[in-house]
Amino acid sequence: MSDQKTILKATIFQYGQIYGGISVAFAIMLFIMDMHYQGGSLQQWAGLLIMVGSITAGQLAFRKLNNGYLNLSEAMKIGLGVTIVGIIIALLYGWFQAIVLDPNQIEKATEFALSQAIDQNPEMTDEMIAVTREWIEWGSSPGISTAFAFGFGLIFGGIVSLVTGLIVKKSRPN
């Protein structure tokens, strides 16, 4: 039993590091292209694809090491563990990028989001623009953005873990 727990922990850390590493590589690519502050659905879909791939690979690797068996509980532990490790790595890099590599990142993101809001709603009044700016700045602060990234990451990681766990699970015969 302890051998199974050791394999579970090792799988979580290995695939969590892979998830975090690929996420950091993607973030570096965006930084080099000066797109790191723009967000967008393509970046979100790419991040989700990286998450799904890392979680699924971890679950399949554990199943292989566990004599071909994986129950839903183990799949959920692996998925959420991989998600937590990967998000921590990505957030640490994100802080490094925002503090060291691009200290103006929050201002760039705020201006970009505000210009997008004005483009989509040209009838915005000055008061509406000021309120929008306040909300964007509040949401872009390091503490709030970290909390949202971690929270949403766990929610999506849980959903992905459940779905992929149901797909790849294989119960032991009774």
Language model regions located:
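Functional transmembrane-helix hotspots
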Residues: Y93-N121
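Individual transmembrane alpha-helix segments
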Residues: R133-I155
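Transmembrane alpha-helical insertion/packing segments
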Residues: M1-A61
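Membrane-helix interface/capping segments
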Residues: Q59-A75
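Short, charged juxtamembrane terminal tails flanking transmembrane helices
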Residues: M1-T6, V168-N174
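Selective transmembrane-helix segments that form parts of the transport pathway or gating/packing helices
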Residues: G16-G21, G79-I88
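Alpha-helical transmembrane segments of multipass membrane proteins
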Residues: I22-F26, L30, I50-I55, G86-A90, ...
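Short membrane-interface loop/juxtamembrane segments of multi-pass integral membrane proteins
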Residues: L114-S140
